């Protein structure tokens, strides 16, 4: 077997590699690493979104459905339910960020109507300042 040198990103995310019996607990560092591991752009903004959407991981949507971003099914309007919070991170990419084509990310979130709150971007910026 040939040994391939690890990239810096792989080295940084090794400590959250998943196995069948071990999934990382939800902490700010683990969430940030999982966001990066999934190739999500603007990881600090996305981290701030998760904190804001869940009220620092206390919301019922997070506790009952492991949904960090308040993602809803456009057909039913119901919140997506995940088996583990890491699935919610992947879903953020596959349901939201894949549409991003460049430019100011916060303005893009506003343009696509990511949140119902007209002051959502200001709230995200406030969380970002505290990180």
Question: What do these predicted regions represent?
Answer:
Residues 1-131:
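Catalytic cores of secreted/periplasmic lytic hydrolases that degrade extracellular macromolecules
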């Amino acid at each position: 077997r040939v040994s391939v040198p690890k990239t810096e990103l792989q080295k940084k995310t090794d400590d959250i590699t998943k196995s069948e019996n071990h999934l990382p607990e939800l902490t700010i560092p683990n969430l940030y690493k999982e966001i990066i591991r999934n190739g999500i752009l603007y990881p600090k903004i996305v981290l701030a979104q998760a904190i804001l959407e869940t009220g620092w991981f206390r919301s019922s949507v997070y506790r009952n459905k492991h949904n960090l971003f308040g993602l809803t099914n456009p057909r039913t309007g119901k919140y997506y339910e995940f088996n583990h919070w890491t699935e919610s991170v992947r879903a953020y990419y596959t349901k939201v960020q894949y549409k991003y084509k460049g430019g100011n990310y916060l303005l893009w979130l506003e343009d696509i109507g990511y949140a119902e709150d007209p002051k959502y971007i200001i709230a995200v910026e406030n969380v970002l300042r505290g990180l």
